[in-house]
Amino acid sequence: MINDVISPEFDENGRALRRIRSFVRRQGRLTKGQQLALDSYWPVMGVEYQAAPVDLNTLFGREAPVVLEIGFGMGTSLVTMAANNPQQNFLGIEVHSPGVGACLSSAHDAGLSNLRIMCHDAVEVLENMIPEASLDMVQLFFPDPWHKARHNKRRIVQTPFVELVKSKLKVGGVFHMATDWQPYAEHMLEVMSGVSGYLNLSEQNDYVPRPDSRPLTKFELRGQRLGHGVWDLMFERKE
């Protein structure tokens, strides 16, 4: 599970298959609690990557709206949302194993049955595992902004990714993004506005107020006290 975050980067002839990725693989050191959670709860809540579509109703054992979160960090907000919305199914994707372990532990403590976790490249999951027009919401909160200009190409929000997300959303489904880096917020808005088939849910056609459905993190609360801004964007699939 942990050692298969990305698919092979070379084909059988040794040709590079690698694409530009929005994350850097850093294994990190697992605490004893995180390792215990991985050993104990991954068999219940963990989902192994496969290069074929998965039936989401079968995955969760029921039919319900599905929310996909990309890059959930330590899982605090994701677990809170899943606990607050038992009528929805939540699928979280994170590439760093300490975060996966922490999220599994918190989800177990909360007694959640509507949360599944993956440890893999989210782009590959979207491309190969998620059926077309199957998601009610995709959440991307505080992705790496890749501040330096020469690294901007690593930002996950690019036109091909936005098109991919749209294809996986149901008509009426929503792509919700949040960032605390204004240049990235402006980049998100520019990219999203350039892709047809989306409707910006902002009345001013830019950013929306933070919806109550997105919990405030400790990091965000600290930023607010320091006067830092946060920008939320919500776009609905219209076609």
Curated annotation (Swiss-Prot):
Subunit structure: Monomer.
Keyword hit for tRNA processing: yes
Gene that encodes the chain: trmB
Pfam family, one: Methyltransf_4
Protein name: tRNA (guanine-N(7)-)-methyltransferase
Catalytic activity: guanosine(46) in tRNA + S-adenosyl-L-methionine = N(7)-methylguanosine(46) in tRNA + S-adenosyl-L-homocysteine
Keywords annotated in UniProt: Methyltransferase, S-adenosyl-L-methionine, Transferase, tRNA processing
EC nos: 2.1.1.33
Binding site for S-adenosyl-L-methionine: E69, E94, D121, D144
Pathway(s) of this molecule: tRNA modification; N(7)-methylguanine-tRNA biosynthesis
